Each structure stands twice: as C-alpha cells, then as structure tokens.
Amino acid sequence: EDYDVGGDMEWKRPSDPKFYITWATGKTFRVGDELEFDFAAGMHDVAVVTKDAFDNCKKENPISHMTTPPVKIMLNTTGPQYYICTVGDHCRVGQKLSINVVGAGGAGGGATPGA
C-alpha cells in the first residue's frame, strides 16, 4: 500500500503537535508499503533518524536525508522507523513521524484481511 504522509495536509509544520501521531494511528505499515512525503521544495525535508534523534529532534548525522520532493521511501525492514523535518523548529513543533513496520504477512492489530 502507498501512504501519502499527512494526507491532505502533506508534510509540513503542523498546527497541532500531535498531527502526525494521529495520522499514523490505526494504520498498519507493512514491508513493501511506500511512504510518500509531499512538501514545498526548500521549505521542508525528510531525514531518516534514530529513536534518540527523533525523541530529541537531533538534526546531525541522520541515517539519510532527502531534500527534493516528493520523497518516496519503500518500507523494506520490520520494526520502528523514524522521520523528521530538519528545517528550523519544525521537528520540535511536531513535524516528525514514527511508525512500526510489520512483515508483509504479519498481523497488524488483529484485523482480519477482507473483513
């Protein structure tokens, strides 16, 4: 499945610091899914970071850093994944996303496929 991060709001500085937490709630991210971060070039970016960098909005030495929209990230490993915007105070005001990726056939929240 392909996910447009933030839906209609896309990837930008949110007015609600919990916006991206709320957006991700209830979604099951699986290996093989793709995240797409849409944003205005030069206004935002996407950095893949560690949990410590995510929790503390550390911008230095990200795992990877993409600045040209749209940024498409294929989910190819299970476990937690962390993304932030490194521009200004954007991460500190909530422009950050953490997800947990499950295996392609893994159960996500007990939902039955096709139910």
Swiss-Prot record:
Task: Pinpoint the Phytocyanin domain residues.
Answer: 1-103
Give the cofactor binding note. Binds 1 copper ion per subunit.
Q: Which UniProt keywords apply?
A: Copper, Disulfide bond, Electron transport, Glycoprotein, Hydroxylation, Metal-binding, Transport
- What SUPFAM superfamilies does the database record attribute to this sequence? Cupredoxins
Q: Which cysteines are joined by disulfide bonds?
A: C57-C91
One cellular component (GO) term of this entry: plasma membrane
Which InterPro entries does this entry report, sorted A to Z? BlueCu_1_BS, Cupredoxin, Phytocyanin-like, Phytocyanin_dom
According to the record, glycans are attached at N76
Q: What is this protein called?
A: Umecyanin
Supply the source organism's classification: Eukaryota, Viridiplantae, Streptophyta, Embryophyta, Tracheophyta
